[in-house]
Design a protein with these regions (language model features):
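Extracellular "leader-to-stem" segments immediately downstream of a signal peptide or signal-anchor
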Residues: 1-190
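Beta-propeller domains
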Residues: 193-196
Length: 196
């Protein structure tokens, strides 16, 4: 008699598990860059499990999640901790479609860090979220052109404010398991949840 147990449709894919850790794992490091590299790699393969090994990971930008991704830590031994924050005024008006801003002092910002531009006009608060791509003196380049105005008379600022994890536009089937998220509120402003 024939064995038909193997004669089943293979509709369930096997997920790849990629390990990330400070001193061991498939990818090694202790900050948002190594975590993002892992998430991006798994995304290219259709998804999988990003297994974050024990450690404290310094977050200078959000971990941008992708579809079909499980981010799994090791319980209280896996901590994603936001780096100390900086808020600084702009010293020059910045308009729609500009991709650089000039600040009073660029210390505390770095290439790759997540930022939030904010201004407070008559119609309320205006917010632009972005990532720093270059710093030349007091001029900070952003990853894309702004779609809002940031004017001095509306108290425009640049701040290292971002969510630790973010799932924007078209992201589905994500699971977050066994991770401690530490917003480091002693050294950061609270983020307005409408803009995280």
């Amino acid at each position: 008699m024939s064995d038909f147990s193997a004669n089943r449709p293979m509709t369930t894919r096997r997920e790849m598990v990629l390990t990330v850790g400070p001193g061991e794992g498939d990818l090694q490091g202790g900050d948002d860059r190594v975590l993002q590299a892992g998430a991006d790699y798994l995304h290219r393969l259709g998804g999988g499990i990003l297994q974050i090994l024990p450690g404290i990971y310094t977050m200078r930008n959000a971990l941008y999640l992708h579809p079909n991704l499980t981010v799994r830590g090791s319980g209280s031994a896996t901590v994603l901790k936001k780096a100390a924050g900086v808020v600084i005024p702009l010293v020059r008006d910045s308009d729609w479609y500009e991709a650089r801003v000039e600040v009073e002092d660029a210390r505390g910002f770095g290439v790759g860090c997540g930022v939030m531009l904010r201004s407070y006009g008559k119609s309320g608060m205006t917010v632009v979220k972005d990532t720093v791509t270059a710093i030349e003196g007091r001029v900070i380049s952003l990853s894309k052109r702004m779609y809002k105005n940031m004017w001095l008379d509306e108290r425009a600022t640049l701040a290292t404010i971002f969510p630790i994890l973010t799932a924007e536009e078209g992201v589905c089937d994500v699971a977050i398991e066994n991770i401690v998220l530490d917003g480091n509120k002693e050294e950061n402003e609270e983020i307005n949840g409408n803009y995280s």
